[in-house]
Amino acid sequence: MADIYIGAHINREKTIINTMESITKNGGNCLQLFVSNPRSSSIGNIENYTNIADDIRKYATTRDFKIIIHSSYTINLARDFKNGKRAVPINECHWIQLLIHELTISHLIGSVGVVVHVGKHTTQSPEYGLENMRIAIAYIIETLQKNDIKTKIILETPAGQGTELLPNLNDFLAFYNEFSSDQQKYLGICLDTAHVWGAGYDICEAYQMICNKNASDLIVVHLNNSKVAKGSNVDRHATLFDSTGTIPYDSIKKFIKLCNEKKQEQEQGHPMQTRQSHTRQTKQAKQARKCDAIIILETPLPQYATEIELIKLLA
């Protein structure tokens, strides 16, 4: 197994296998991709993935390669359960069905999970939006359990742009830890460095905060620089080692080393996390859960190949 998985979210080539091969050719061993139109709420034909799932799984297994799916940007976990303006039962809600569709594809192709943004409360109160998120996530997890769909909903740390919920990392982790240990088998965390920077955190501080409480739940890192000032609550990515980026190079270098060190600690059998619940701490002490350190560069070609090599050197 790789010590750390490094890859990118790049435009899809003719096939997913071709895209995976492109990542491999450029020194990476993981890929993030969309399986739905990122700007549309339409649900595609799952047969498109059923027919190629075995080939994707075989490529990933033989080359120790990881796949991550990013959800459609149209999904808002905090919104009401409506189709248009019409309130509907949650099982008929179109955006709920879209996320379940993406999670089903994730299971089919052997993806680790689906990264999804936390919700925006829009015109409702933050409390109302958070309750919608709780209900939505719990319902989707129940659906995954009933249908034996083995994949994860990976919640991404927010920048706090507009009415985006949970920009405070303590609040984000508290919300995550409201879910039971059984529910958390279907959950994970994605740390986006540009987002936490926008939310007001040094990226290494954010990493340590998550590791102190939920290290084995931290599955994916979106490793980006930022175009905006720290604490601006704005989500604007920049190329990782861009000299115009606002996240200092030394912070990025230290962050990469932290990721590698934590992965090595975990492989040596040292529990990486402490839990707030005594019951869960005891269970953790008996059997440390292991996760993969997956770094995704959200950088266009051709820069990502150079960045992969630099990350390997810094790690």
Please report, for each region that a protein language model flagged, where it lies by residue:
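Active-site acidic/histidine proton-transfer and metal-coordination neighborhood
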Residues: 61-62, 77-188, 198
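Intrinsically disordered, low-complexity repeat/linker tracts enriched for polar/charged residues
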Residues: 143, 264-290
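Acidic (Asp/Glu)-rich catalytic clusters
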Residues: 21-28, 46-68, 100-110, 140-149, ...
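Active-site beta-loop-alpha junctions enriched in small/polar residues
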Residues: 9-13, 36-38, 72-74, 119-121, ...
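N-terminal pre-domain/capping segments
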Residues: 1-101
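C-terminal helical cap(s) of enzyme catalytic domains, especially alpha/beta-barrels
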Residues: 304-315
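Hydrophobic faces of well-ordered beta-strands that scaffold small-molecule active sites
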Residues: 4-10, 29-33, 67-71, 114-116, ...
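Gly/Pro-rich active-site loop or hairpin
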Residues: 44, 86-92, 127, 165-169, ...
